[in-house]
């Protein structure tokens, strides 16, 4: 168990350092208050979820730490995760470059709104992992896994991705960049592609999933899609 905690701590530190590098190096300055606030919100949200899982659901924490292109088994998902990773990097780097070259001017209240959206995203993700102990970071069906149709899963089929949406939209705003929203062009197709491919996999491999999709019509956004 201690190995799991140390691994979680190590990954958190690596993630923090990588995020700091992706923000402050392209920005060319440490005088970037939006980045400090965003990192506090993002790291705080990530840490809160990690601590919750470490206490309440260590097995899910282990599943969720197995993440990234190399963790996926399906070749299609490996490709999708590469695009998703590049998209998230762009969500950080483009606003940082915007800060450096002053491409856009975002009011402070918009940046605060962005941080609120990021916080909302983490809150929605918390509700998902609290409801579903099989919410792994990779597409798989674990032994004994059943269809979850309660909580956020009663509203949309993919509440984890729904929770990611405000986080993605809020990130460039929190970092003080209108141009950063353009990076969503790279991320959103990967998200939708992953969602549809995951549904194909679950229809085939998770008993009861097809019946669940007839009950819950919306995939990502209620009354929209």
Which residues make up each language-model segment?
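Membrane-anchoring alpha-helices and their flanking helix-loop junctions
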Residues: 1-150, 162-225
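Histidine-centered phosphotransfer motif of kinases
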Residues: 154-162
């Amino acid at each position: 168990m201690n190995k799991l905690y140390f691994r979680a701590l190590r990954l958190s530190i690596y993630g923090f350092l990588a995020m700091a590098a992706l923000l402050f190096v392209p920005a060319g300055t440490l005088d970037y208050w939006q980045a400090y606030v965003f990192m506090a919100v993002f790291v705080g949200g990530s840490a809160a979820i990690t601590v919750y899982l470490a206490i309440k659901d260590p097995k899910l924490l282990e599943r969720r730490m197995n993440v990234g292109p190399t963790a996926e088994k399906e070749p299609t998902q490996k490709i999708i995760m590469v695009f998703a990773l590049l998209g998230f990097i762009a969500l950080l780097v483009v606003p940082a470059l915007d800060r450096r070259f002053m491409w856009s001017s975002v009011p402070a209240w918009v940046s605060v709104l962005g941080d609120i959206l990021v916080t909302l995203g983490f809150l929605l993700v918390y509700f998902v992992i609290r409801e579903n102990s099989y919410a792994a970071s990779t597409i798989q069906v674990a032994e004994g896994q059943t269809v979850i149709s309660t909580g956020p899963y009663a509203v949309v089929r993919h509440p984890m991705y729904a929770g990611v949406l405000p986080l993605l939209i809020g990130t460039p705003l929190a970092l003080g960049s209108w141009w950063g929203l353009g990076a969503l062009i790279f991320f959103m197709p990967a998200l939708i592609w992953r969602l549809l491919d995951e549904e194909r996999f679950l229809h085939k491999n998770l008993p009861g999933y097809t019946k669940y999709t007839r009950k819950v019509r919306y995939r990502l956004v209620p009354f929209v899609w």
